[in-house]
Amino acid sequence: MDYRDSLNLPKTNFKMKANLAQREPMILKRWEKEGLYQMLQERAQDRPLFVLHDGPPYANGHIHLGHAFNKILKDIILRSKRASGFNAPYVPGWDCHGLPIEHNVDKELGEEKKKTIPILAKRAACRKYANKWIKTQKPEFKRLGVLGDWEDPYLTINYSYEAAIAREFNKFLLSGSVVRNRKPVYWCSTCTTALAEAEVEYHDHTSPSIYVKFPVIEDFSDVDPALAGDKTFVVIWTTTPWTLPSNTAVAFHPKFQYAAVAVGEETWVLAEDLVEKFMQEVGIEDYSIKSTFTAEKLENRNCRHPFMDRDSRLVFADYVTTEAGTGCVHTAPGHGADDYATGLRYGLEVLSPVDGDGIYTKEAGPYAGRQVPEVNSDIIADLAESGLLVFKKDINHSYPHCWRCRKPVMYRATPQWFISMENNDLRKKALKNIESVSWTPSWGMNRIHSMVESRPDWCLSRQRTWGVPLTVISCKDCGEVVKSEEVVAKIDELFLKEGADAWFSHPVEDFLPEGHVCTCGCATFIKEEDILDVWFDSGSSFAAVCELRDDLVAPADLYLEGSDQHRGWFQSSLITATGTRGYAPFKGVLTHGYVVDGQGKKMSKSVGNVVAPQEVIDEYGAEILRLWVSSEDYRDDVKVSKEILKQVSDSYRKIRNTIRYFLGNLNDFDPSKDRIAVSEMSELDRWALARFEELRAKITESYDKYEFHAINQSLNYFCGTTMSAFYLDIIKDRLYVEGTDSTIRRASQTVLYDILDGLLRLMSPVLSFTAADAWNALYSLGEKDSLEKSVFFADFPVAIDPQFDAEQEARWQRLIKIRSELTKALELARRDKVIGHSLEAEVLVKGEGELGEFIHAEWQHLREISIVSAMSEIEGAPEESAYVSEEVEGLVVSVKLAPGVKCDRCWIRSTTVGDSVEHPQLCSRCLAIVEDMDLEMDA
């Protein structure tokens, strides 16, 4: 007879095979049709607000895995905040101006057309290009399961946003923080524009490393009489020979000891601490130190430029070091920030004889018309010919490159517009505001503090087309800038109506009060043609988005981006808000590392180690990406590879199977009718509830601390070890075998229901697709009055009392340890073919002293959790083959085949099988259950 129909076997529509890649789009379609995000916002109107402000990705190209990691991390946080009782809106944004878009539009236009196309036509082409990629990226972000106001995102090309950018700039202008100077800035000769620090990337680059002699005009006899009449040279080191035409000084450290070194018939001056190292590098063995002295008497002396017809002054600078070179630093104020500062102190001429295309101008003498830095070889050859080149070799070092074209950049002195970090104490205020912000990881505060502390003035101007203009109007005759609230209001009015294009389509008169005249008497004015640094665009988002949208607020609770944004968006936002509002635009900042390959190397198409999110989604589904994000410690660089994703997929499968087991065993459970009170549950059931309460507390705390990898670890351990390998394994018998409505079965089902309810709430921020599907299955069981229709409407579970005290905790920890030893003994018996399955076994146990008393007192619990057919105590001396535990002192275990015959229904071996004539295959327990079922059917 087949007793299968008499068992309570699991049934569920929640499939074992997830088919995430096919299933997820259907779930997304349902969320969109229901208006899930809008419903969440409507339901949360009266809740406290939590604003995570989205740092806008660039509207160019398909999203990469770094984008996916960032967006999923944000979504996990926002979903967890909603489940914690907050109103947590998400307004995604896009950065739409700037060089990368203009660069690609130029390529589409071609060489000839890009030079002749009218400015408004080119701006229209750039706007069209940005919108094209927004339309491409939006569904790619939504496919990740990211909830947000995708129908009304913020775009930096929206007219209202462009007007806000101009307003913020004009606040700086009116306050006196905006200045125009000719000073060295990063310059890309390929893109022909100035660059901000945040637009510069560092890559390995090969440069010539040369040592050059500068002839001293007057001997050093007053420094040391021994040097009288010597043919003396100051030796400098540089890796940028092309800047030598701009040299106006050689810098010494005022406190260093310097040496006059005899080399042949010449005397060379360099730092004493570097003499030996220098001579070894240049291969000179025959030398002697004639004199040592401090630099005090060297200041304001002159040496002769090695090839230009002028002198170079000897000056002091604290940034001179003895880490490399000679301690005598080539100084060109037109080609370096430190050099420029030194030049200001000494009144040196700021020479920068290089045009925007990187071509030497006539001021470069014999090198005029030549390209930088190709001219390096000519300069080196000329130095060698004149006898002033000491040594030359090539070195590989980290060098600044343009973020767009990836070509090396230069420092070049040009007239530019800057936000002064000193005017209005901007630097001081920004540094103070940094200290008021919560930084995660904590080292982020020191990082951005040191950056702001040492950063130069912010170069705002860009010599390009696609961006918001520098809304500066100045007198044609005297150059005085018009600073007027009335002008600002007119700019704002036109920008709100027509966008920033208005600056280029309207004459200057449309922005000025009627009849406006300069203080010099001139009535002719000109508009600035440069555009703003794109970092000012995104840095103004707190004003353009958070302050203007009804669903947001400034300052935001959290900014979350990659750690590179300490010198990018975080810093531009901080400076902009500090300069116009006096406070930081964020209360907290969280940063994550870069996404790298499995070996920790940067992803590169040329190397072939790029993992595209689209490929991962097609193979595994977005859920696996979400689980991967939560499994990694985002504070460091995050590794990803096919092997890692497969491991994550395996981990997901275990969690899913646990959920499926729960649902399968709840198929006949109606929580409104079948629930059993905690007080009526067995200790095992209450132990399981205690473990879930422990998990709930740990996970909710981890969400609050943004420690998502800890959540992942907790979920995996709970599902795989606590539940599947222990509790679920033990209660399988009561779930399948006991009477359908028996108290012991309904009690365990109550535990399963409550744990699953809470588990789905806890995992929903991470495994959103799976939680949504499983919740629908749970919702169908009944109790609809108390259960939210969507898991995303449900808050995290509240604390429960499992009625499981400290004494019980201690006892069960000990029981589980003993059970672990019994399992080892069963494994050995299985290996030796004594038994097959543990249900075939009789376990004989002996405990010495107090252990024996404990085992005797907990006999029923130990019997229950061991999953064997029989258990008895060892009488007398144990057999030689018995297992002696090393973990539990005094414990001896012996295993043998249990007496009796295997019951066809519960598979437990029992001596009562065969006692019934009608059901000879059943044990006495199963017989009673089946007879009860027959009676119920008859009734």
Curated annotation (Swiss-Prot):
PROSITE patterns: AA_TRNA_LIGASE_I
Gene Ontology CC entries for this record: cytosol
Superkingdom, taxonomy of origin: Bacteria
Catalysed reaction, written as an equation: tRNA(Ile) + L-isoleucine + ATP = L-isoleucyl-tRNA(Ile) + AMP + diphosphate
Cofactor: Zn(2+)
Cellular compartments annotated: Cytoplasm
One GO BP: isoleucyl-tRNA aminoacylation
Residues the entry annotates as binding Zn(2+): C903, C906, C923, C926
Acyltransferase found in the keyword field: no
Cited Pfam families: Anticodon_1 (PF08264), tRNA-synt_1 (PF00133), zf-FPG_IleRS (PF06827)
EC code: 6.1.1.5
Family affiliation: Belongs to the class-I aminoacyl-tRNA synthetase family. IleS type 1 subfamily.
Subunit structure: Monomer.
Name of this chain's protein: Isoleucine--tRNA ligase
Species the sequence originates in: Desulfotalea psychrophila (strain LSv54 / DSM 12343)
